From Swiss-Prot:
GO cellular component: cytoplasm
GO molecular function: ATP binding; magnesium ion binding; methionine adenosyltransferase activity
Name of this protein: S-adenosylmethionine synthase
Family note: Belongs to the AdoMet synthase family.
InterPro entries: ADOMET_SYNTHASE_CS, S-AdoMet_synt_C, S-AdoMet_synt_central, S-AdoMet_synt_N, S-AdoMet_synthetase, S-AdoMet_synthetase_sfam
Catalytic activity: L-methionine + ATP + H2O = S-adenosyl-L-methionine + phosphate + diphosphate
Entries under SUPFAM superfamilies matching the protein: S-adenosylmethionine synthetase
Stretch list, region Flexible loop: 99-109
Cofactor binding note of this UniProt entry: Binds 2 divalent ions per subunit. Binds 1 potassium ion per subunit.
Listed cofactors: Mg(2+); K(+)
Subunit structure and binding partners: Homotetramer; dimer of dimers.
Positions with a binding annotation for K(+): 43
Origin organism lineage: Bacteria, Pseudomonadati, Pseudomonadota, Betaproteobacteria, Neisseriales
Enzyme nomenclature, EC number: 2.5.1.6
Length: 389
């Protein structure tokens, strides 16, 4: 029987790029709490002893950006110089400009050539869903995120007090080529930052028994499964001290772990007038409802936009041979049941709220918290009825 391998990875909230993402989204949320119509493109850089805030912000909100950055870094767990990065001691620089008026006139409703609220930029976005997990996410990315959440829980609860904030997980999964179903887990890679005193064997055993095995389905862990735990043997220096972190550098971790294409636009720090974020969320919403409706077991949607223009320049769908109706019919249903203009997306998903901080770690999709409105399947019944199933 033929089979193939597929791999996805996740990183913890203490990974330097994720620190940057979380600072950017915390600043976005602080602004939206006061000014829901603000235009925000907040970028963050973190390095040893340094946090730089830059980008374009147009708002009436009064926000202490330095305080928000420090509080976010502290919440993640970088609160001591022993960790190489200290929320209270690092230097924080603020270098925000305002949004270009040339861009603003294309986005502001009633201005520019298209009087509707136009897209904030050109670009292409993808959404994806499949039936491999309860949240209709691909297996490898879903469980990679769960491993990282487990690492964080054990660190913060003090059950494994030698854990430090920075960590990464990677799963290689074996699929059956004929059915396309997951057969077993081939390799688990988990690297976690740790205190210098902990011995390697104690660390390895604790990671396998207390992080990995409680999370991964036991029936998919076999005698052939390989465990690669801190493969270099030591991971004391980590976080922004180990590597410079930047907003928007973990776009595959943020989405589908490579199981679906990515249009290239990052999410964190961007208000929902930026279709890089809002349209990608809408695409996930569409794809998930199609799968939840039983119209396909796998669904990928692409949309594209032109700056200043409200209507998408294209919509395409691929169900990889699993569709119960044609892809042309699915596109018609999508146009009938989902408003994919920027203003329509914002209203449909209620995006002008301070809801983004949670999304900046452990994935933007496959989440069940109430803030993640794009994970609802409230359109599934209507889609199924309209399809005649």
């Amino acid at each position: 029987m033929s089979e193939y391998l597929f791999t996805s990875e996740s990183v913890s909230e203490g990974h330097p790029d994720k620190v940057a993402d979380q600072v950017s989204d915390a600043i976005l949320d602080a602004i939206l709490a006061q000014d829901p119509k603000a235009r925000v493109a907040a970028e963050t850089l973190v390095n040893t002893g340094l946090c730089v805030l830059a980008g374009e912000i147009t708002t009436t909100a009064q926000v202490d950006y330095i305080k928000v950055a420090r509080e976010t870094i502290k919440r993640i767990g970088y609160n001591s110089s022993e960790l190489g990065f200290d929320a209270n001691g690092c230097a924080v620089g603020v270098y925000y400009d305002q949004q270009s008026p040339d861009i603003a006139q294309g986005v502001n409703e009633g201005e520019g050539i298209d009087l509707n609220q136009g897209a904030g930029d050109q670009g292409l976005m993808f959404g994806y869903a499949c039936d491999e997990t309860p949240t209709l996410m691909p297996f490898a990315i879903y469980y990679s995120h769960r491993l990282m959440q487990r690492q964080s829980e054990l660190r913060k609860d003090g059950l494994l007090p030698w854990l430090r904030p920075d960590a990464k997980a990677q799963l290689t999964v074996v699929y059956d080529s004929e059915s396309g179903k997951v057969k077993r887990i081939d390799t688990v890679v988990l690297s976690t930052q740790h205190d210098p005193e902990i011995g390697y064997e104690e660390l390895k055993n604790a990671v396998i028994e207390q992080i990995i095995k409680p999370v991964l389905p036991s029936e998919l862990l076999t005698d052939e499964t390989k465990y690669l735990i801190n493969p270099t043997g030591r991971f004391v220096i980590g976080g922004p001290q180990g590597d410079c972190g930047l907003t928007g550098r973990k776009i595959i971790v943020d989405t589908y772990g490579g199981a679906a294409p990515h249009g290239g636009g990052a999410f964190s720090g961007k208000d929902p007038s930026k279709v890089d974020r809002s349209a990608a969320y809408a695409c996930r919403y569409v794809a998930k409802n199609i799968v939840a409706a039983g119209l396909a077991t796998q669904c990928q949607i692409q949309v594209s936009y032109a700056i200043g223009v409200a209507e998408p320049t294209s919509i395409s769908i691929d169900t990889f041979g699993t569709g119960k109706i044609s892809e042309e019919k699915l596109i018609t249903l999508v146009r009938e049941h989902f408003d994919l203009r920027p203003k329509g997306i914002v209203q449909m998903l209620d995006l002008l709220r301070p809801i983004y901080s949670k999304s900046a770690a452990y994935g933007h999709f496959g989440r069940e918290e109430p803030e993640f409105t794009w994970e609802r399947t409230d359109k599934a019944a209507a889609l199924r009825a309209a399809a005649g199933l």
